[in-house]
């Protein structure tokens, strides 16, 4: 019965053990006893005075967070609390619909701009992950909203409101990060073409043997910057200083992490960061990452201002289109933590 189901959320409801296709090799399991709790190791940036007299100090906080960690939390971010609450409720309601209603949106085609799927890339990977996800393209919203799920009833309206609000936040973050690199505040934004914005609503059902599998294994994000909304259940872990650190949810904050495109544009002044999602046997978990990215035709390369051959700061990466990078990212199916090395400039 379980084998015929498309989604792990429907498999989880009928099994008391992890099916063999979800079991990781012994050498690649979470080892939760070795995981540390974040404490103060993940920076928290208060954006309240970003546009006030303390801007320079906050920009310095961005520089420190991006260069030392690549992961940080933000508060006073401007996304209304009610908007966040409605988005999380809509996400829960979507995954609590009947199996027949949910699978209407199922597709394994990674090029589809709206799709429900499972794991990461089921057509390529060797071991499945304990995750279902609804992926939505959402900028420009008018190009995609009519293909989003129409149920629950308020889903499109709520998601559009959330996506619009988070995009405004991202544009503010990009200005701050650009300034923190010593660049004009619009430099990074102008590098990524017409811009792209995707969302994933990740659903991690309860798992009978969480020590055997992952929600998502260790990976780095392909995009420019990710803004993550978590529910109250812990599951995100970041690799820092040779250890996995659990990033426990903090109310009214977002988690922000840099992706591979920021690593390229900054010429490795800033780096994308390895992270993963683990599951548990007690509670389902929902996370909603917003992936902000270049448009597919955007040509990505290190910012010229950050290249100086005479001071031993050559361009580390060659020019490439984001479409080329994104296709490579999906094809790896997380067999590697990142595909960024294949885009390095030739040293021959």
Swiss-Prot record:
* Positions contributing to 2-oxoglutarate binding: 285
Its GO biological process terms? defense response to oomycetes; salicylic acid catabolic process
| Cofactor(s) needed for function | Fe(2+)
The cofactor binding remark recorded in the entry reads:
Binds 1 Fe(2+) ion per subunit.
Q: What's the family?
A: Belongs to the iron/ascorbate-dependent oxidoreductase family.
The opening ranks of the lineage are: Eukaryota, Viridiplantae, Streptophyta, Embryophyta, Tracheophyta
Every copy of the Fe2OG dioxygenase domain together lies at: 194-294
UniProt KW keywords: Dioxygenase, Iron, Metal-binding, NAD, Oxidoreductase, Plant defense
**What is the originating organism of this protein?**
Arabidopsis thaliana
Extract the InterPro entries matched here: DIOX_N, IPNS-like_FE2OG_OXY, IPNS-like_sf, Oxoglu/Fe-dep_dioxygenase_dom, Plant_2OG-oxidoreductases
Physiological role:
Converts salicylic acid (SA) to 2,3-dihydroxybenzoic acid (2,3-DHBA). Negative regulator of defense against Hyaloperonospora arabidopsidis. (Microbial infection) Confers susceptibility to the downy mildew pathogen Hyaloperonospora arabidopsidis.
The enzyme's E.C. designation:
1.14.11.-, 1.14.13.-
In Gene Ontology terms, what is one molecular function of this protein? dioxygenase activity
This enzyme catalyses: salicylate + NADH + O2 + H(+) = 2,3-dihydroxybenzoate + NAD(+) + H2O
What is this protein identified as?
Answer: Protein DMR6-LIKE OXYGENASE 2
Q: Which residues are Fe cation-binding?
A: 219, 221, 275
Name of the encoding gene: DLO2
């Amino acid at each position: 019965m379980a084998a015929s189901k498309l989604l792990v959320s429907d498999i989880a409801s009928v099994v008391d053990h992890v099916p063999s296709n979800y079991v990781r090799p012994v050498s690649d399991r979470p080892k939760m006893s070795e995981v540390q709790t974040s404490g103060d190791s993940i920076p928290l940036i208060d954006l309240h005075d970003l546009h006030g007299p303390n801007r320079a100090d906050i920009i310095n906080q961005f520089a420190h967070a991006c260069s030392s960690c690549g992961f940080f939390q933000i508060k006073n971010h401007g996304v209304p609390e009610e908007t966040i609450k409605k988005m999380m409720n809509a996400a829960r309601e979507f995954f609590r619909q009947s199996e027949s209603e949910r699978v209407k949106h199922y597709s394994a085609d990674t090029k589809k701009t709206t799709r429900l799927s499972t794991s990461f890339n089921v057509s390529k990977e060797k071991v499945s992950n304990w995750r279902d996800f609804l992926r939505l393209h959402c900028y420009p919203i008018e190009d995609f909203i009519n293909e989003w799920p129409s149920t629950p009833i308020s889903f499109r309206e709520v998601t559009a409101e959330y996506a619009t609000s988070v995009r405004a936040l991202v544009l503010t973050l990009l200005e701050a990060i650009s300034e923190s690199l010593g660049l004009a505040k619009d430099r990074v934004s102008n590098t990524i073409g017409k811009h792209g914005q995707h969302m994933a609503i990740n659903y991690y059902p309860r798992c009978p043997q969480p020590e055997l599998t992952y929600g998502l294994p260790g990976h780095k994000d392909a995009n420019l910057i990710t803004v993550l909304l978590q529910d109250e259940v812990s599951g995100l872990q970041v690799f820092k200083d040779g250890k996995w650190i659990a990033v426990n949810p903090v109310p009214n904050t977002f988690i922000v992490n840099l992706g591979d495109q920021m690593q390229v544009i900054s010429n490795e002044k800033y780096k994308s960061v390895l992270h993963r999602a683990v599951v548990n046997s007690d509670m389902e978990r929902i996370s909603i990452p917003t992936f902000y990215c270049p448009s597919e035709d955007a040509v990505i390369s290190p910012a010229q201002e950050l290249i100086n051959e005479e001071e031993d700061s050559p361009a580390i990466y060659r020019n490439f289109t984001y479409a080329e990078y994104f296709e490579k990212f999906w094809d790896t199916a997380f067999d590697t933590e990142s595909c960024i090395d294949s885009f390095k400039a030739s040293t021959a």
